């Protein structure tokens, strides 16, 4: 769904929440992001400060969490274990991310076979697919040229796996 201030207000009211000026401003920032750009709560807070908005970091965190739970924002786990957010798309807009663990450069890619295989596995196990995200951790060419280590930082570990065979 593409949210406007009015549709967001209706959605929030239906769930017992209010459309505060802070939430409206946060929605506006996400609506104006170029496609493929994601923001962490800290990056969002920095943008709000640049626009002279007086919104505390804790309010930003609470707002993005709420909007994520409501399906307005999509929560992504990208580089360094930080959560990033993007506006949820109306139609199935499954895409995946390649992330450099050294400089956090992120690119998006689409691969319908990943989604199809995920759906197949979910059906087999009796699960209902809600979202499909793949984050490929890499070292980008620029980081390699700069001589950054080509190993994962010690705080990185593959914590989830599923066999799609």
Curated annotation (Swiss-Prot):
Gene Ontology molecular function: any one: transcription cis-regulatory region binding
Alphabetical list of Pfam families matching this protein: FUR (PF01475)
Sequence positions that bind Fe cation: 94, 96
Keyword Secreted attached: no
Region of interest (DNA-binding), residue spans: 1-91
Residues binding Zn(2+): 38, 86, 97, 100, 103, 108
GO cellular component entries: cytoplasm
Xref: InterPro entries: FUR, Fur_C, WH-like_DNA-bd_sf, WH_DNA-bd_sf
Region (Dimerization), start-end ranges: 92-165
Compartments where located: Cytoplasm
Annotated keywords: Cytoplasm, DNA-binding, Iron, Metal-binding, Repressor, Transcription, Transcription regulation, Zinc
CDD domains membership: Fur_like
Tree of life domain: Bacteria
Record GO biological process: negative regulation of DNA-templated transcription; regulation of secondary metabolite biosynthetic process
Subunit note: Homodimer.
Annotated PANTHER family: FERRIC UPTAKE REGULATION PROTEIN, ZINC UPTAKE REGULATION PROTEIN
Function (record text): Acts as a global negative controlling element, employing Fe(2+) as a cofactor to bind the operator of the repressed genes.
Family membership: Belongs to the Fur family.
Protein name: Ferric uptake regulation protein
Source organism of the structure: Synechocystis sp. (strain ATCC 27184 / PCC 6803 / Kazusa)
Gene name of this polypeptide: fur
């Amino acid at each position: 769904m593409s949210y406007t201030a009015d549709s967001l207000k209706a959605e929030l009211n239906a769930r017992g929440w209010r459309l505060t000026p802070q939430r409206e401003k946060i929605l506006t920032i996400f609506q104006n992001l170029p496609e493929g750009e994601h923001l962490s709560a800290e990056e969002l807070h920095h943008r709000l400060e640049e626009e002279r908005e007086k919104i505390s970091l804790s309010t930003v965190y609470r707002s993005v969490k709420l909007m994520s739970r409501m399906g307005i924002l999509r929560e992504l786990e990208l580089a360094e274990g930080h959560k990033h957010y993007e506006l949820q798309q109306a139609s199935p807009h499954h895409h995946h991310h390649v992330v450099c663990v050294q400089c956090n450069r992120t690119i998006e890619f689409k691969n319908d076979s990943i989604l199809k295989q995920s759906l197949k596995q979910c059906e087999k196990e009796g699960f209902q697919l809600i979202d499909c995200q793949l984050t490929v951790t890499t070292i980008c060419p620029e980081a390699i040229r700069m001589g950054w280590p080509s190993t994962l930082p010690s705080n990185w570990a593959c914590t989830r796996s599923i066999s799609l065979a």
